[in-house]
């Protein structure tokens, strides 16, 4: 049976577009262990939790961002399936916008750094092709949906 994890692709919008005309920045966290990979906040489902509850709990634990500080974007949910540590893994992501552009990030010990990044930079740091594709799909979804 595959390991199951859930998370949120957290983003914020600039009020004024940057020089490259982008307004969306994604939050990526750098793991403290292993290859120090960059991903959105995510974690394993605990017994009795549903997937979205897991995503919100993991976000709170890993970033300090509470559910009340986020808006979950309707209509976007992605399931990634891959092998991690020789075991099949399923990760489900939703898009979530921070309500406060300057929200404080408080990292857990699981992560050593965070960055807010435009799509191109986020895809460069996200080493896994499935994560890059999910970020691109999320960006495209946001750009085709009124803010």
From Swiss-Prot:
Cofactor note: Divalent metal ions.
GO cellular component terms listed in the entry, alphabetical order: mitochondrion
Gene3D superfamilies tied to this protein: Nucleoside Triphosphate Pyrophosphohydrolase
Keywords from the UniProt entry: Acetylation, GTP-binding, Hydrolase, Nucleotide-binding
Gene: Nudt2
Catalytic activity: P(1),P(4)-bis(5'-guanosyl) tetraphosphate + H2O = GMP + GTP + 2 H(+); a 5'-end CoA-ribonucleoside in mRNA + H2O = a 5'-end phospho-adenosine-phospho-ribonucleoside in mRNA + (R)-4'-phosphopantetheine + 2 H(+); a 5'-end FAD-phospho-ribonucleoside in mRNA + H2O = a 5'-end phospho-adenosine-phospho-ribonucleoside in mRNA + FMN + 2 H(+)
GO terms classed as biological process: apoptotic process
PANTHER family associated with the record: BIS(5'-NUCLEOSYL)-TETRAPHOSPHATASE [ASYMMETRICAL], DIADENOSINE 5,5-P1,P4-TETRAPHOSPHATE PYROPHOSPHOHYDROLASE MUTT
Known cofactor(s): a divalent metal cation
Native source organism of the sequence: Mus musculus (Mouse)
Motif (Nudix box): 43-64
Name this polypeptide is given: Bis(5'-nucleosyl)-tetraphosphatase [asymmetrical]
GO molecular function: bis(5'-nucleosyl)-tetraphosphatase (asymmetrical) activity; GTP binding
Function, as annotated: Catalyzes the asymmetric hydrolysis of diadenosine 5',5'''-P1,P4-tetraphosphate (Ap4A) to yield AMP and ATP. Exhibits decapping activity towards FAD-capped RNAs and dpCoA-capped RNAs in vitro.
